[in-house]
C-alpha cells in the first residue's frame, strides 16, 4: 500500500519507521517503501544504477540498488584529517569518488545496503554527521567561501553553524539506528518544537552570502542572510525569503523564483528570525499538493506582506529596513589569493565537483597528498570547487608541486572561462529523477561549445553555464546565462538570460532540442554579443540578451529579479 509523504512522516515515530527491519532484511538490497522516504531525513537516498536497469530486468534480477549518502557540513568547512577520513570511506564503502554538492556538502555514491550502517558510523566518527542532509527539513546551510574575507568568513561560518544546529530535528532516531544509542523513553523526551509531528511541507534551504560575492546564489534559497560589512566589521544581515529553483515541465502551477529582500537583523536576532520563518512555512505551507509545498509558493499564495507580518509576529520584533549592498558576481576566484591575516588560499576548479582518479587526472590521490600535509582547512564552494585555505606562504611551493603532479590545475587552466564556471547535477545513472545526462555530458557539451566561443573571441569571457538532468534544478540552472534542463535522453530545454550575479531568472528560449540545435541557436546570439556588447561595463551575455531585446523576462507569475533599488 502506498502512503502519502505526510502520512509517512506523521506515523514514523519521529523518523524511525521500520528502518531497522528494512536494513536487516537480507532478501533484498532495497528498503521498504515507506522507509525509502524516511531515510532521506537521515541523509541518504535509495537509488539504483539506471545504466544496467534494463539488463537486470531481462535477467529477472531486482535493480542494482545502492545508496547515496550526503553529509551535513555547514559552510563546507572540514579539516585535513576529516578529509582523509572521508577519502577512506569513499574508497572502502562507496564508488571510489567524492562529490562536492552545490550546497557545500559531500556525497558518497554506490553504498550497498549491508554496508550502509558501517558507512554512517564511519562518517560520524569523523565528527561529521548526515542528519537532515535530505528530507522535509532545513538542509545543509551554505556560507560564502570567499577566501579574501578571512575574519568575516569566520563570523559567517559560526553564525551558519549556529543556525544549522538550532534547526536540527530533535529526534534521537538517527543516533539509535546508526550509532546504537540507547532507546528514548518517556512521552516528552522527543518534542519537536520547531518541526512538529509532520516536519516541514517540503525541503528548506538557507544560505549566508558576503557581498560583493554571491557564490551561494542566496536568492535561490528559501531563507537568505546577506552580510552587511562596513570597514571589515559585520553589522548584521539583510534577510531574503522565498527563493527556489524547482519546477515541473509543462506545469504552469510551478516555477522557479528569486527571493525578496524583506529587512535587516542583527547577529543576535538570527535564531529568532530563522525560527519564525521556518515555523511560518511549517504552519502555512501547502501540505495537500506536494509540488506546491515549497516556501516560494506559500509566499505567492498568501502574499509577501502577509508572510512578513507573520514572521515578525512570531519573531517578536519588527525587521529593520534593508541595508544597501551590491553583488558583483556569483563565481569563484581560481588560484592563490592572500587573506587578511597574511596566509594564503588556493581555489581549485573541480568539474561538477567530482573527485576521483581517472585516466587523465588523479584528483582523489592529489587531494589526499595535500591533506596529508596537515595544514589549513578545506572549504567546499557552492560552485562545486575547493579552497585549500589558511596555507602559510612558505608552504605554497609544496602545494603547487602536488597540484601539478596530480593534474589538479587542469580545471583552473581550462581552455574556456565557460568550462571553469560551469556546474552540473549528478543526473544519470544514479538520480531517479533525471530525464537526461548532466554531469557526464558537461565535458562534451563544453567541448562542443568551445569552437563557437573561440570563433567569436569569447574563449576567455565568463559565461555562467549550468546543466540539470531534470527541472528540479539542483545545479541552480534557472539563474544561469545559459542553462540546459533535461527533457528526455539527449534533449534539453535551452534557458537563456540569467546574470553573473545570481539576481535574475532566465527564460525558455528553445524547448526539447538536441545538441546540434542548441549550438545552432546559440551561434547567432554569441556572434551578436561579441560584436555589440558594452565592453566599458564588461556586459555579461545574459545582460546583453535583455538589453538587446533578444529575450524577455520569463513569464512566471512570481518574483523574477532582485529589486535593483536595494543595490544603490
Curated annotation (Swiss-Prot):
Q: What does this protein do?
A: Component of the sulfite reductase complex that catalyzes the 6-electron reduction of sulfite to sulfide. This is one of several activities required for the biosynthesis of L-cysteine from sulfate.
Name the UniProt key words of this record, in alphabetical order: 4Fe-4S, Amino-acid biosynthesis, Cysteine biosynthesis, Heme, Iron, Iron-sulfur, Metal-binding, NADP, Oxidoreductase
Which reaction is recorded as catalysed by this protein? hydrogen sulfide + 3 NADP(+) + 3 H2O = sulfite + 3 NADPH + 4 H(+)
Can you tell me where the transmembrane regions are? none
Q: Subunit composition?
A: Alpha(8)-beta(8). The alpha component is a flavoprotein, the beta component is a hemoprotein.
User: What is the protein's name according to its record?
Assistant: Sulfite reductase [NADPH] hemoprotein beta-component
Q: How is the cofactor bound?
A: Binds 1 siroheme per subunit.
Organism of origin: Xanthomonas campestris pv. campestris (strain B100)
Give the source's domain of life in one word: Bacteria
* Annotated Gene Ontology cellular component terms: sulfite reductase complex (NADPH)
Amino acid at each position: 500500500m502506498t502512503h502519502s509523504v505526510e502520512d509517512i512522516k506523521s506515523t514514523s515515530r519521529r523518523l524511525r519507521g521500520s528502518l531497522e527491519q528494512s536494513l536487516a532484511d537480507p532478501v533484498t538490497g532495497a528498503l521498504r517503501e515507506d522507509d525509502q522516504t524516511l531515510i532521506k531525513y537521515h541523509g541518504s537516498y535509495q537509488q539504483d544504477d539506471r545504466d544496467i536497469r534494463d539488463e537486470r530486468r531481462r535477467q529477472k534480477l531486482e535493480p542494482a540498488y545502492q545508496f547515496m549518502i550526503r553529509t551535513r557540513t555547514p559552510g563546507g568547512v572540514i579539516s585535513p584529517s576529516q578529509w582523509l577520513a572521508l577519502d577512506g570511506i569513499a574508497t572502502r564503502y562507496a564508488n571510489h569518488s567524492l562529490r562536492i554538492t552545490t550546497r557545500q556538502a559531500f556525497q558518497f555514491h554506490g553504498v550497498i545496503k549491508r554496508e550502509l550502517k558501517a558507512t554512517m558510523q564511519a562518517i560520524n566518527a569523523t565528527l561529521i554527521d548526515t542528519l537532515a542532509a535530505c528530507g522535509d527539513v532545513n538542509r545543509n546551510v551554505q556560507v560564502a567561501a570567499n577566501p579574501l574575507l578571512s575574519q568575516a568568513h569566520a563570523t559567517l561560518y559560526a553564525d551558519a553553524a549556529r543556525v544549522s544546529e538550532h534547526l536540527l530535528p530533535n529526534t534521537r532516531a538517527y543516533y539509535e539506528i546508526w550509532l546504537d544509542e540507547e532507546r528514548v523513553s518517556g512521552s516528552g523526551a522527543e518534542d519537536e518544537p520547531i518541526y512538529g509531528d509532520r516536519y516541514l511541507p517540503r525541503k528548506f534551504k538557507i544560505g549566508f552570502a558576503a557581498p560583493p560575492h554571491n557564490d551561494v546564489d542566496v536568492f535561490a534559497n528559501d531563507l537568505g542572510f546577506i552580510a552587511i560589512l562596513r570597514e571589515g566589521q559585520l553589522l548584521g544581515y539583510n534577510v531574503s525569503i522565498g527563493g527556489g529553483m524547482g519546477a515541473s515541465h509543462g506545469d504552469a502551477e510551478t516555477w522557479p523564483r528569486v527571493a525578496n529582500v524583506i529587512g535587516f537583523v542583527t547577529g543576535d536576532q538570527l535564531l529568532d528570525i530563522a525560527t519564525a520563518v521556518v515555523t511560518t512555512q511549517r504552519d502555512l505551507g501547502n501540505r495537500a499538493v506536494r509540488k506546491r509545498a515549497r516556501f516560494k509558493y506559500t509566499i505567492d499564495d498568501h502574499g509577501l506582506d502577509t508572510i512578513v507580518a507573520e514572521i515578525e509576529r512570531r519573531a517578536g520584533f519588527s525587521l529593520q529596513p534593508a541595508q544597501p549592498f551590491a553583488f558583483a558576481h556569483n563565481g569563484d576566484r581560481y588560484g592563490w589569493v592572500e587573506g587578511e591575516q597574511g596566509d594564503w588560499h588556493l581555489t581549485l576548479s573541480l568539474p561538477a565537483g567530482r573527485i576521483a582518479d581517472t585516466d587523465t587526472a588523479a584528483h582523489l590521490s592529489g587531494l589526499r597528498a595535500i591533506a596529508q600535509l596537515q595544514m589549513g582547512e578545506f572549504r567546499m564552494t557552492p560552485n562545486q570547487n575547493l579552497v585549500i585555505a589558511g596555507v602559510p606562504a612558505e608552504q605554497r611551493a609544496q602545494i603547487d608541486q602536488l597540484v601539478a603532479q596530480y593534474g589538479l590545475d587542469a580545471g583552473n587552466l581550462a581552455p574556456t572561462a565557460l568550462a571553469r564556471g560551469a556546474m552540473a547535477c549528478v543526473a544519470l545513472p544514479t538520480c531517479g529523477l533525471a530525464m537526461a545526462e548532466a554531469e557526464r555530458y558537461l565535458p562534451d557539451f563544453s567541448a562542443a561549445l568551445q569552437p563557437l566561443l573561440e570563433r567569436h573571441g569569447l574563449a576567455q569571457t565568463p559565461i555562467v553555464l549550468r546543466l540539470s538532468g531534470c527541472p528540479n534544478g539542483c545545479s541552480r540552472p534557472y539563474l544561469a546565462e545559459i542553462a540546459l534542463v533535461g527533457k528526455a535522453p539527449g534533449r534539453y530545454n535551452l534557458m537563456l538570460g540569467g546574470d553573473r550575479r545570481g539576481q535574475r531568472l532566465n527564460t525558455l528560449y528553445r524547448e526539447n532540442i538536441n545538441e546540434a540545435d542548441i549550438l545552432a541557436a546559440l551561434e547567432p546570439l554569441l556572434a551578436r554579443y561579441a560584436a555589440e556588447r558594452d565592453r566599458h561595463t564588461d556586459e555579461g551575455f545574459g545582460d546583453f540578451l535583455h538589453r538587446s531585446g533578444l529575450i524577455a523576462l520569463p513569464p512566471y507569475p512570481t518574483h523574477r529579479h532582485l529589486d535593483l533599488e536595494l543595490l544603490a
